[in-house]
Amino acid sequence: LLIQLFGRASICTNVSTNDPCIPLQSAEQFATQFEDQLATGRCEGLTVLAAKIHAEGGTPASLVAAEAVSTNIDYWWATQMLPSVAAKSRLSRSLKPSQLVNEIRQGVVRGATSTLGMYFQNKGHSVLPISIQKKGEKVVVGVYDSNTPEMTQTLTINTKTQVWVYSPVDKTGKVLFTWRHKGAGALDVIPL
């Protein structure tokens, strides 16, 4: 996976051979860190894969071998580690919620082509914006959440107070949790 993302020259000591990769020490350390982070959740990979399947009109994941789906989820999850994606995330997080509304709208208009990351109390979660509607000072973003794939959830942004709220519900309507934040620093929008 790391060779796919960063290239053999960045990962292996034996760049000029066709032998199995002998990883650089830094690559081994990164792989360990990578595995630890991957163990905490794969929502980014699930979100990106869902967007790709939707955009490309591909075969639904339920009709593909589990190993192939898992490999794709891990790959797309790992892309958030790429320097260009990490830089976009940092830039996006520096903006107020109201400043992200247009980027969210562009992703929705293009056919669900951006991820929306939310950060709250040292946790993070990624969802796929699929609709957007302005209601006065509030913007209601309909999202696909891989934790509740059968139903559309909503994230609400108050453009006046700069507060966003995400309270996903289960099939019975029970609120699973509530995340809320005021100001910049806790949302990112990453175009695919």
What are these regions (language model features)?
Residues G41, S114, H125-V127, V139:
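Residue-level detector of short, conserved catalytic/binding motifs and their immediate flanks
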Residues Q121-G124, Q133-L192:
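Cys-His-centered catalytic/binding microenvironment captured across papain-like cysteine peptidases
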Residues P129-S131:
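Conserved hydrophobic positions within beta-strands
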Residues L5, Y75-W76, V163, T178:
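Residues in intrinsically disordered, low-complexity segments of regulatory proteins
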Residues L1-S70:
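Active-site-adjacent structural segments surrounding the nucleophilic cysteine of cysteine proteases
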Residues G45, L49-G124, S146:
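Conserved active-site-adjacent core of cysteine acyl-enzyme catalytic domains
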